[in-house]
């Protein structure tokens, strides 16, 4: 597999649909990790794109929650609690004792669990949204294909946020 100079896996130019979706999702997961690399704890907690309170550490925590929601709750139908507790259901809130290592470990555990849950599933297999979630989508059933495309979109959008935050912190751009 080819990688970018910063170590992210380059998605193949030609592949079957499943391989392509997984590769792009992995690329965007790796992009978020790159955006957080080399920073100190106080920098990861810095809300650097005013007026937003979003931080790089909060984004990592949020994506752990997003991974859990879409692969465990929606696709596999599991009743699992929020990754970082009921009072932090979206993952954005920071806790003074939790740094990047703990947040990344939780995020990577959620990524691994999601991979396990979809390993033998087909792209047309469906998960089930709550009525509230279905109101946004228009249907309570969503295919694994839909979930994977949504996850790519979710990471791409938040990686754009991470770009802005990182640039404000130390001037690093790209990736």
UniProtKB/Swiss-Prot annotation:
Keywords: Transposable element
Record-linked SUPFAM superfamilies: DinB/YfiT-like putative metalloenzymes
Pfam families: MST (PF04978)
UniProt keyword annotation of Metal-binding present: no
Stated name of the protein: Mini-circle uncharacterized 19.1 kDa protein
Organism: Streptomyces coelicolor (strain ATCC BAA-471 / A3(2) / M145)
């Amino acid at each position: 597999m080819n990688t970018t100079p910063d170590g992210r896996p380059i998605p193949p130019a030609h592949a079957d649909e499943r391989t392509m979706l997984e590769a792009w999702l992995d690329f965007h997961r790796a992009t978020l990790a790159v955006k957080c690399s080399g920073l100190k704890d106080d920098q990861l907690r810095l809300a650097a794109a005013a007026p937003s309170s979003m931080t790089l550490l909060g984004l990592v925590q949020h994506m752990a929650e997003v991974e859990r929601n879409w692969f465990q709750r929606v696709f596999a139908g599991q009743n699992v609690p929020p990754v970082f507790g009921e009072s932090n259901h979206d993952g954005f809130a920071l806790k003074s004792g939790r740094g990047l290592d703990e947040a990344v470990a939780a995020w990577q555990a959620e990524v691994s669990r999601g991979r396990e849950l979809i390993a033998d599933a087909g792209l047309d297999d469906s998960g089930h949204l709550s009525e509230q979630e279905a109101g946004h989508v228009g249907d309570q059933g969503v295919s694994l294909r839909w979930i994977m495309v949504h996850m790519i979109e979710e990471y791409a959008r938040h990686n754009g946020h991470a770009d802005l935050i990182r640039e404000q912190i130390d001037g690093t751009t790209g990736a």
